[in-house]
């Protein structure tokens, strides 16, 4: 379960990042004052992200932190009825 939520979070970050004029991982990392490999780890679902870093990422992407946790709009990951 833990790995699943990390993967979903990473997919959401990537989806929003690419929808913002194809923002690169490097540019996002710069805007967040984080390392590019940290962003890469997040997007691959291998990094556990702190609330502080979720806030930094959401600000850099111009979204609310809750938007990064809304997994209903990722590919096949729709809420089950």
Curated annotation (Swiss-Prot):
Q: Which GO terms describe its molecular function?
A: DNA binding; DNA-binding transcription factor activity
- The entry's DNA-binding region: 25-44
The question of whether Zinc is a record keyword is answered with no
Matches recorded under PROSITE patterns? HTH_CROC1 (PS50943)
Q: Where is the HTH cro/C1-type domain?
A: 13-68
Disulfide cross-links: none
Quick check: keyword Electron transport in the entry? no
Alphabetical list of Pfam families matching this protein: HTH_3
Q: Which Gene3D superfamilies match?
A: lambda repressor-like DNA-binding domains
Q: What Gene Ontology terms describe where this protein resides (cellular component)?
A: cytosol
* Keywords assigned: DNA-binding, Restriction system, Transcription, Transcription regulation
Supply the name of the protein: Control protein C.BamHI
Provide the species name.
Answer: Bacillus amyloliquefaciens
């Amino acid at each position: 379960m833990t790995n699943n939520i990390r993967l979903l979070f990473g997919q959401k970050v990537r989806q929003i990042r690419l929808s913002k004029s194809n923002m690169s991982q490097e540019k996002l990392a710069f805007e967040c004052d984080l390392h590019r490999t940290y962003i890469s780890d997040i997007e691959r679902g291998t990094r556990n992200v702190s609330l502080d870093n979720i806030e930094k990422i959401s600000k850099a992407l111009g979204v609310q932190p809750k938007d990064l946790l809304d997994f209903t709009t990722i590919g096949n990951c729709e809420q089950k009825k």
